[in-house]
Every structure is written in C-alpha cells, then in structure tokens.
C-alpha cells in the first residue's frame, strides 16, 4: 500500500472527509498525516471511527449526521425537496438545486463549440478541457508508472486512481472482511454484497439491488422505457446514446458529417484505410486503435479489472461486465419483432431470428450440411473428425459435447433430478422426461414429410428419415463401414475391440450395449411390459410389439428391391437380401464356418461349447436352440400345425412339411459339388459332404467315438444309456431308434414298400433292397483285410473273418498250425 504524507488545512480536511461517502475511512492511520489542533479533532473523527450517529434501520454507524440523514431518506423514500415546476422530489439539497437550474435554464456557462449547457462551475471547468487542444505540457498529469501505458489525465485524482491497477495498490479496505479495493466507491458498494444488504428495492416485483444504477436499469423492464433518443435518426436505446451516435457519425470520406473529436476522426479513417499501426509485442496482432490493443493485451496478462459488485465476478472488458450485469437486473433489451420474445444479448436475438427466417448460414465443408448457429456447426464437425475433447474424470470416457459429458456424469452420481408428475418416475435428463410424458399423453408431434408417419421423438423422426434418404453418416475408422445410427456404429466398433461393457448379474452374459442388457434381463424376470391393444398379447420388447401389430394390419413395409418380396420386419429383409448377395458376415471363431444370421452362429457355437440352455418342462430334456425346444414340445402336445395341401398330411415341423413336399414333387434342388448327387434338403447336402471330407464333428463323451451326423451320435449314445424310447403297440417290443420301430411294425402289417427295379421283388426295409440289388450289379463292397476276398453283405464278411482267420490264428497259437 502506498505511503502518502498529507497536510490538511480545515477546508481541505472537510473535502477529504467528504470523499468517504459513509463517513468512515479505511486504513488511513499509516499515512502519517499532520494538521493543527482544531483540524486534528475533526480528522480524528474520521480516522478513529468516532461514530456518534447510528442508523436504527440498517445498524450502521456514522461519524457525521448528514450521511445518517441521507441513509434514512434512502430507506424511507422520503424526499425533502420538491421541484416547483414538475413536482419531482429529491432527497438531497444539491440535487434539488441543480434540477431547478435545469428547469429555469439558469446555466453557469455554455460552451461555444458544442452548445452544451453546464449548471455547475466544476462541471463547466472540466468540460472546457475536452474542447481545448492541450499540448503535451498542458496535460499536467501523465501516467508513467512502470512505463505501462503513459495515459494522460486532466485531473490528478483520476491519475492516482488509474495507477492503482498498475501498482496493485488497494488503499480502501472494508473492515468487516478485510477485503481491499482500488477505488473508494468499491468499499462503499461492497458491504451490501458482503452482508446481503440491498438498499434499492423495485416497487413492482420486490427485487433488491446493491446499487441505484442497477435498480434504474431493472425498472426499464416494467416501464419498457428506452431513455436515450438520438435526434439524428429517431431511434431509441436502453444502452447509452453516445454508443449509438458513434455508429451514426460519419465523415467526408464516407459521405457524412464531421466527428466531435480529432482522435475519433483519425480512428475512423484507419478503419476505412485498413491501417492498423498498433502491434501486440506478444503475438504480433495489429489493431487500428490503442484501446483495442490494450483490451487485447489482457488476454496475455490475464488482467480482469472490471468487477461485478453483485457477485464479485471479474471481466477483462467493461462491455462484458455491462452485459453480465443483466443477469442480476433481469434486463432483456433485445426484442424479437416477430414473436416478441426478449433476450439479454444481441447475438442471442440474431440467432433466434433465424428460426423465423429459416436462415442457415454455416455450412459443413465435408458434407455440405447447413446450420443456423456456428456452435452447431463446430459440434457437427466432430462427427467427421472424431474429436471428443470432453473427458469424464470418473471413467475416462470422452464426449464430443460438454452437455453430453454433464449428462453422462449423472450416471456416476446417480442423480435423476427430473420427475414425472403422472407416475413419479425420475429421469437423468429433462429431454428424457419430456419424451416419457408423451407415453401418458399419446402425443406424436413429429411427422415424416415423405410417408406421413408420426413419432413421439424428433430423434426418432430423424433416424426414420434416413430410410428415405439412405444417409449413413456414421463411419467406422477401422474398416470404413458406414451406419445410419450412432448406436449401430458403437456396437460395431466393439467387434474390433472385443469390448463387452455390460454383464448380466444372473447368468454372466455380456453385451455391447446397456439397452441390450436391459432387454436380456427380461428373460430372467419374465417381464413383458408391451401389450397388444388388439389381442392382449404381451412382449418383452417394443419392437416385437410393433412387428406383431402388423399381423393385425397386414402391413409389410419392407420390400426386397431384387425380387419384390415384402417383409413385416426390416431385420427379416436384411437377412433375406443375403440370399441374393451370398453374404455370410458371421464367422465361428472355432471352426471358421460362416453364417448369414447371428442367431445361426450363436446356435452353431453351442456345438463347440455343449451348452443347452433351453429345457423342456415336461421331460427335462435340454436343447441348444429355442426353436428346437418349441418343436420338441409338440411331441407332448401332439400338435402338428403344418399341413400338406395336396394330401392333407400334417407335420410338427415346417422343415418336415417342406421335405414331404419335395418327396411328392421329386424336387432335389441341393447338389453336392464333389459328386453331383442331389438332395431334397440343404442339411442333407451338408451331411453328405462329410463322406468326401471325412469330417466327424460329433464325438461321444463316453467312449470318444466320432460321428459325421448329430443324429447318429444321439442314436449311438443310447447304447451307453440303454434307452429304448420307441415301443411297438402290437407286441410291446422297444427300440432305440424310430426307424427300427418303423421297420419292425412292417412285420405286423406285412407292408413291403421297397421294390427291386430289376426283378420286382419287394422288401420291408430299404437297406434290404440295397443289399439285394448287389446281386444284379455284382457289387461286393466289403473286402477282407487278411485275404482280399469280397462280400455282398457286411455280415458275411464278419462271419468269414471269424471262421477263417480268427480260427487259424487260434490253432497256430495252440501248435496245430501248418508244418
């Protein structure tokens, strides 16, 4: 703090004391001030805080009576002085006198250059200095503190006040909290901020303010007053008139009138000429005005000299402070001519007006999409760049938008501040609450302009419109595959990372997406919250309900552009299109086999894991697929829903019906690429091809014997279990295989359906016919490893081997071999 030696005579002391508006000076004892005895008594009233006058309303003490009187008038609103002409009231005599001079036209002086009228001598003297063209030696007070700015002042007091931010000096201290200030007005304004004491109250709404100027600004909200009228153009402004006049002021170069100041004229000329003589030594940026340079330099110094007296927030520019103060006053001076909505900032009004004009001036250089706001364009750019500058401190996840980060952080805090009035359900986001409330109202305000379909959410409409446009704005950085939905991209990216974030607590199954986990949990809980209004059937997922409702309406909105076939579900269309493209995007990690559907891959993988999660409630038998369980259930119920239109025969499985139809038609569309043999079913081809490859993927877990077919393995396993589940109704004999039972029943019926084409002989079993046909063909497929003799039947080979070679070996071992 600066040490100043001050010598006062009585008059100077009186003026010194008047600078302290509350009658109290802070931290002045260290100045070393000296005065005569009489003056010292008066001086001590100030510096020893001899406060004889106390305000009963506010509890504040004063050293003199006049500040107390003024304080009480402020609180009570009492005005002692009334104007004779306009009946305006004043609480101070000085203000009353000045007002009367204004009314009477009694001017202390009128300046020749600008005809401004001044009613007080002090004002007139100060005003003259504005017009006088002072030379360097006539500007008596020059700032040279630390060589900062060399700004000159007409008043020494202004110089001292100006130098304090350079020196860091804060001479005035508020004794309640020891906070120091550069200006004497700041500790006067500060107590109201410190104790929450706001003297100036609005009569309309009751809002209170620390400063009368802020109250005056606030009152304009109620009065709609725009006090500054410019005679030149007739427009009125809530902001100062001078600022507007600067924009209207013109000079000879641009066809207008002259400037009031030479410096203003020169500054304006630089703008027209593009001249920028003032350069920042930090970054080299140039400016046309020194004031602009000084304001810019605060970016480098971090200086924020303008402080809000309401909340103590600081700003680098005075204009920023002025705009900020509207937060406290509630002033919204910028009004929309179209809808009457008012705004705190002019920039906010301009942005709002684009709603009415439809203007979108900001265009994306990558995809040519346009936006109404520059901030929206910057946010959109991050889709193309992949930039996510906002990172969560809890989990490290990054986001493209700060609003999304803030919303995400509620996951960690578990905060759900938005509650539904109808059902009491709470939400993390306000948008989620609004969307939820449409469930209660049934409102769907968003309509597709192409197909007139309506949606409850705007986001759902935007996603839907991509069906018509074919737009896929989300691209994978790894494989460059594009997606219509961001969620689909995120799910896809987990294929590359292998990451599965969400785990089911019941069964441990993991999912890429939280929504998938929520849906999966309903398997365990049995919850089916979505009900069909037509038939009452319930579903675990909303998409299932939507698809089901199309059964009632007959709607099939998804059409194949290759063959014209239509589908109820889009997923069914996508799967169908793979028939035309031959695409099989799902590959088994164990054996490399590929599938066109994910469900087929999942079912296939259970072959390797042995998992059978679907259990029959009747017999306890387990299955790898839910469809297999449903088909099995029909054994217990006897249901055969699939009927042949030609012969009326019914089947429990649709695959059995298709196979039956091919038997009648003789169709065999599936051909083996190795030998050209054709089959009526695709599964038969797959099974047959194992003859060529020698593959036997099904292994018995008891004896380890491998099999080419799963059905063969199941039959084999009955040897170990002794199971014979197929019983003859005629004689009660049981069999391990259904085919054996069918063959046996022909003994009772005498049926011989298999006939030889060569000789017409008929047989009860197909295997017997095949053996018989070898008589005509001469085929003997079974060869003895010992002697090379061949046989028609496998049984004949076994008999030969036992009788001839096994007997010979036995005799040789006993010493009866050939000599």
UniProtKB/Swiss-Prot annotation:
Zinc finger boundaries on the chain: C2H2-type: 141-166, 200-222, 278-300, 306-328, 334-356, 362-384, 390-412, 418-440, 446-468, 474-496, 502-524, 530-552, 558-580, 586-608, 614-636, 642-664, 670-692, 698-720, 726-748, 754-776, 782-805
Principal localisation: nucleus
Database matches in InterPro entries: C2H2-ZF_domain, Znf_C2H2_sf, Znf_C2H2_type
PROSITE patterns: ZINC_FINGER_C2H2_1, ZINC_FINGER_C2H2_2
Compartment list: Nucleus
Single GO BP term: regulation of transcription by RNA polymerase II
Disulfide bonds: none
Any one GO molecular-function label of the UniProt entry: zinc ion binding
UniProt GO cellular component terms: nucleus
Role, per record: May be involved in transcriptional regulation.
Protein name: Zinc finger protein 658B
